[in-house]
Regions:
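Extended helical coiled-coil dimerization/tether regions that scaffold
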Residues: 3, 13, 249-321
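Electropositive, glycine-dotted interaction segments
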Residues: 113-286
Length: 361
């Protein structure tokens, strides 16, 4: 299956210093049948210090987390950091985006909106969420609502039977978790006599879009590792052998953002990981020619190898953890650039701060 996503527009309000709504167009032309996202892949957001560039990246990361992690707003430490992220004056905000979706040349345009606010108990709650779609070949068509929720209650989704089933399953939950993250947990329980129809598929497309989002930002989520190890433990307990490369890449990126540097590599993907590290070594040698190689120190860990990288120089070996901050940032940057080359939507905050001017001459 060939799956491609392209971010058309992004609207943000109430994140960090964004106290007034802002709108970003990543493609200003009318979408036509011959639209080719490959020609419009690289965009730059620039402005003065304090103009809101990092706030935009933060909003994208928040959007991704809300869509893929149904427990995101339940975490106490996450709530504490989110309260600091929401604009102090507005105490509420929203994110809205238009997404071009092409799956095996079946094209759609999705419009997703989610709003949130700090309530009297000092916690962040989702106040409204909706998803609409229209034909991707004819962008002037009107949007059709896929689902909508307000104040924690589902107001529309699918036909009457599907709606009643899903509404009961999500009762009093949708102010604490997004509908997209909630519906995936129902897949095994969904009655076979219920018609899932295109609405369900469209929500899955939205979830897939969220997985394709890749955000490189300095203020790492220090609580990510705990959630990831819980996910891995769940995989082990359920004896799921279908641990895909896509899933692994997602976990790997998030672990790299967290405090630890060791990563868990599924044994069936270890050869691919070695190839990736060989490319990483060549990339770092551009900036640090004295590096001879990067080797993987692996330890057996059930279905995984626990891997740590060793930086090999002519007269000494250095654990990755003790490499210079600049080189570690370049190593992280490599993974994000590689994912961008693989078609993922990648946001990199302060890209110029990662690369010294001497390398750009």
């Amino acid at each position: 299956m060939n799956r491609h996503f392209y971010l058309l527009t992004l609207d943000i309000y109430g994140i960090k210093n964004i106290a007034n709504p802002i709108h970003l167009d990543f493609y200003k032309k009318t979408i036509k049948r011959d639209f080719n996202p490959e020609k419009y892949k690289i965009k730059a957001i620039y402005g003065e210090n304090g103009s809101g560039k990092t706030a935009i990246i933060t909003a994208v990361k928040l959007l991704r987390n809300l869509l893929i992690d149904k427990n995101y707003l339940s975490d106490h430490e996450t709530q504490k950091s989110l309260v600091e992220i929401i604009n102090k004056k507005t105490r509420n905000g929203y994110i809205e985006c238009e997404i071009y979706v092409d799956i095996d040349e079946d094209r759609e345009i999705l419009d997703y909106y989610i709003s949130f606010e700090i309530k009297d108990d000092g916690r962040i709650y989702i106040t409204e969420e909706r998803l609409s779609r229209k034909n991707g070949n004819y962008s002037k068509n009107s949007y059709l609502c896929v689902f909508e929720s307000k104040d924690g209650a589902l107001e529309k989704f699918g036909n009457d039977k599907v709606y009643e089933f899903v509404k009961e399953k999500t009762l009093n939950l949708l102010d604490k978790q997004s509908f997209a993250s909630s519906i995936l947990t129902m897949m095994n329980d969904f009655p076979h006599d219920k018609d899932l129809n295109n609405d369900f598929v469209t929500v899955i497309e939205l979830f897939a879009f969220a997985i394709s989002l890749n955000v490189c930002i300095d203020n790492a989520d220090i609580h990510t590792n705990n959630r990831l190890y819980q996910k891995i433990q769940s995989i082990e307990e359920n004896k799921k052998d279908s641990f895909t490369k896509e899933t692994f890449n997602q976990l790997k990126r998030e672990i790299l953002e967290a405090s630890g540097r060791d990563i868990l590599v599924p044994k069936n993907l270890y050869s691919s990981y070695e190839e990736q590290i060989a490319k990483l070594s060549m990339f770092i040698q551009i900036f640090k020619p004295e590096l001879v190689n990067i080797e993987v120190d692996k330890k057996d860990f059930d279905q995984f190898y626990k891997c740590n990288l060793k930086m090999i120089y002519e007269n000494y070996t250095l654990d990755q953890e003790f490499e210079s901050r600049g080189i570690k940032k370049m190593m992280d940057l490599f993974y994000y650039l590689e994912d961008a080359c693989m078609g993922m939507i990648t946001f990199i905050d302060e890209l110029d701060s990662n690369i010294n001017d001497v390398y750009l001459d």
